A protein has these predicted regions:
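Nucleotide-sugar donor-binding/catalytic module of glycosyltransferases
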Residues: 1-109
Length: 109
């Protein structure tokens, strides 16, 4: 079980997705699971997610059959989450490489 489950709802963000996922897999705190919920993207987002999942076993991909919006996608991801803590990152954003280390240390102190 991961300490932190990071949920990323994805819809047509292929332009930004590499930077987002790179920022997550390169965290200084690596006891995370990265749950990416593809919300029926019509671009190459799903292919990008699958590539990252093959490279890093912390990356999990969930496919929504229909575009349902970020709230439903996040709720679907929550059902798969095993972490003690939950974090949300937008798929067109990225985080600093020590973000989750700082967050975790703050929570446990």
């Amino acid at each position: 079980m991961a300490k932190i489950s990071v949920l990323v709802a994805v819809y047509n963000t292929e332009k930004y997705l590499h930077q987002c996922l790179d920022s997550l897999i390169n965290q200084t705190f690596d006891d995370i699971e990265i749950i990416c919920i593809n919300d029926a993207s019509t671009d190459c987002s799903l292919k990008i997610l699958q590539t990252y999942a093959k490279k890093d076993n912390r990356v999990k991909v969930l496919e929504m059959p229909l575009n349902s919006g970020s709230a439903k996608a996040r709720n679907a991801g929550l059902r798969l989450a095993t972490g003690d803590f939950i974090a949300f990152v937008d798929s067109d954003d990225w985080v600093s490489n020590n973000a989750f280390e700082q967050i975790y240390n703050t929570f446990i102190s």
